[in-house]
Amino acid sequence: MKFAVIVFPGSNCDVDMFHAIKDELGEEVDYVWHDTENLDGYDAILLPGGFSYGDYLRCGAISRFANAMKAVQKAAEQGKPILGVCNGFQILVESGLLPGALMRNENLKFMCRTVQLRVENNETMFTSQYEKDEVINIPIAHGEGNYYCDEETLKQLEENNQIAFRYVENPNGSVSDIAGIVNEKGNVLGMMPHPERAVDELLGGAEGLKVFQSILKQWRETYVVNA
């Protein structure tokens, strides 16, 4: 399986994402610059955290216009797994690939610590290796991670089982304790916590690795078993 890590000016978690795939998952991965127009050679696309384009205007607001995002849109339409973490989640929302918005944290402070997440839906291509309602420890590092959507959108997210992760103790004011959501099709996941920073016990825990293992399992079942 071959992954692409999209690198924007200001990305700073791309190396962590690359390490998670190459060294921990053991799969092929490339850094792909934001001006690429073709992602056809990749099986999964990863949008890392950071401060793309300095987070001017709004987090992710400029990145949505990058050439690579047109290719990401195409990959999403093809059903390829798209994972956006932290700033990557913000970019997915700004691009319209996921509903809602990310606002300033409720306390107006940047937060950097490990939090507990509850797996709300373990039937997605990103969460199949977890147990339903499993509680996992994953780091956060954001100033604008307060997820917001209107009541109608929240109702749709809940009815369609699109809420992948919730905070056990809400750190930022996110509506309904939401930490991560998938699109209706189930192949695009956005989450504020950083699973790529929790893939090695030496780094404090490996509970984030199952996100990437789930993607790999889905790909093998779809393309290797059926080959």
Curated annotation (Swiss-Prot):
This is Phosphoribosylformylglycinamidine synthase subunit PurQ. It comes from Bacillus cereus (strain 03BB102). GO terms for cellular component: cytoplasm. GO terms for molecular function: ATP binding; glutaminase activity; phosphoribosylformylglycinamidine synthase activity. Keywords: ATP-binding, Cytoplasm, Glutamine amidotransferase, Hydrolase, Ligase, Nucleotide-binding, Purine biosynthesis. Coiled coil: none annotated. The gene is purQ. Its EC number is 6.3.5.3, 3.5.1.2. It catalyses: N(2)-formyl-N(1)-(5-phospho-beta-D-ribosyl)glycinamide + L-glutamine + ATP + H2O = 2-formamido-N(1)-(5-O-phospho-beta-D-ribosyl)acetamidine + L-glutamate + ADP + phosphate + H(+); L-glutamine + H2O = L-glutamate + NH4(+). Pathway: Purine metabolism; IMP biosynthesis via de novo pathway; 5-amino-1-(5-phospho-D-ribosyl)imidazole from N(2)-formyl-N(1)-(5-phospho-D-ribosyl)glycinamide: step 1/2. Transmembrane segments: none annotated. InterPro entries: Class_I_gatase-like, PRibForGlyAmidine_synth_PurQ. It is found in: Cytoplasm.
